[in-house]
Amino acid sequence: MTSSEEVVEVTVVKAPEAGGGKLSRRKIRKKDAGVDGLVKWERFLPKIALRVLLVEADDSTRQIIAALLRKCSYRVAAVPDGLKAWEMLKGKPESVDLILTEVDLPSISGYALLTLIMEHDICKNIPVIMMSTQDSVNTVYKCMLKGAADYLVKPLRRNELRNLWQHVWRRQTSLAPDSFPWNESVGQQKAEGASANNSNGKRDDHVVSGNGGDAQSSCTRPEMEGESADVEVSARDAVQMECAKSQFNETRLLANELQSKQAEAIDFMGASFRRTGRRNREESVAQYESRIELDLSLRRPNASENQSSGDRPSLHPSSASAFTRYVHRPLQTQCSASPVVTDQRKNVAASQDDNIVLMNQYNTSEPPPNAPRRNDTSFYTGADSPGPPFSNQLNSWPGQSSYPTPTPINNIQFRDPNTAYTSAMAPASLSPSPSSVSPHEYSSMFHPFNSKPEGLQDRDCSMDVDERRYVSSATEHSAIGNHIDQLIEKKNEDGYSLSVGKIQQSLQREAALTKFRMKRKDRCYEKKVRYESRKKLAEQRPRIKGQFVRQVQSTQAP
């Protein structure tokens, strides 16, 4: 015997009975702290004694489960019938901490017992665990919907029974997590909760004695009233509903903003390039100047750049892009190919001198502040060459738009603008763009008053073919504007195709189909067979209606 243990002898004297007096002695071993000051911390932990109501119809199964529960430190009360279990619960609901019941029961099934428990005011706070040999999802789902805390499939395992106390702990903690007294049992707390009007919430310490005389206590907390729980749940649901509504409204606002931004981007990229012929001429000049910058880089128009602060970032291709040579190429001049204002055209004189004066006034007009300064040269190639004579065809063109000019075919300019609309036109994608032609060439080629294509033909033929190859059809549409729309309508009437890109796509597809058909003709399995032996064996094997049959070996006589 160690020095840290001390034996105390206690004599208990009982009152004399009919059979005579009896003296009993018990030796109590008292463990105190030793010299080294070690204290066993297990004696400070609370000891939980959960009382389980076991409802099982089969006698042997009931005895086995009760024995397992007792080994796991539970106090078990076993009943064979659901009706008896319900009567026991109605009589003393505070004496049960956990209910373990079978689904299939006589007199009252497990579903009915579960429904009765969930409808009772006091018993509904007791965790009910259903058990059965059936493991179907429908059965489990039905039990969970009725309010079961868990579902166990037979045969039960010991670790499952050891963890049953967690259901009681979770249930009591979820009801009132603030106060959790460790020195009172679950059933006594429920009884005091039912008689809380007399005690006014004051609890006394109770000691539950076991069969062996040792004192045990269980940790639980008092139940809360159902009404207060419902009020808390309803308040929490209302707050969650308000939060959900606010989040939904914010989501709708963000979605509307995104849709409006996408619509603006679509209008900026495509629809803004289609202009009607009756718009203001000054707006058309500003839009055309911005189109030169919008050739292959997404820059904003000059009018919008003057108004805005320039905070929005612009899109530019990377340095490895094929369009870099066009995007970063500086624009030497930024001229407008639009005709003069309608008021000026009405006052144009028939003489050549007045025409030259008018053209000089147009050329020396002040450019917009953001655009680079133009050269002081004329719209025409040679400085010494006289200006082209004006004709009476200015007001004779029907439906004249911003710059109604004929499209050149193979770099050949039409002499008469009236014959340009009746002749065969080249596709829109073949016409040069401002990014691939110098400003002087572009202004002289597409100016409506130009009647000298011979002087420009050499300069037009010097245009680099490689540069024109990179220009897309969408860029040409944006550069030429409304005149392309008129040409497309005319070409639709004459029966010509709308774009060369579609023709090239159809030609490539036709060539691919032809190549595929030629390869398919070469794949003739009759001409080349990889395994000759397999072919011979297949021909020798007997067939019945095309299917191979097992060959019967004929027995030869000795």
Curated annotation (Swiss-Prot):
Compositional bias annotation for Polar residues: 303-319
Post-translational modification: Phosphorylation varies throughout the diurnal cycle and enhances ADO1 binding. O-fucosylated by SPY. O-fucosylation promotes APRR5 proteolysis.
Key words of the record: Biological rhythms, Coiled coil, Nucleus, Phosphoprotein, Transcription, Transcription regulation, Two-component regulatory system
Keyword Cytoplasm: no
Region ranges (Disordered): 180-233, 297-319, 535-558
Record domain CCT: where: 509-551
Name of protein: Two-component response regulator-like APRR5
Organism listed in the record: Arabidopsis thaliana
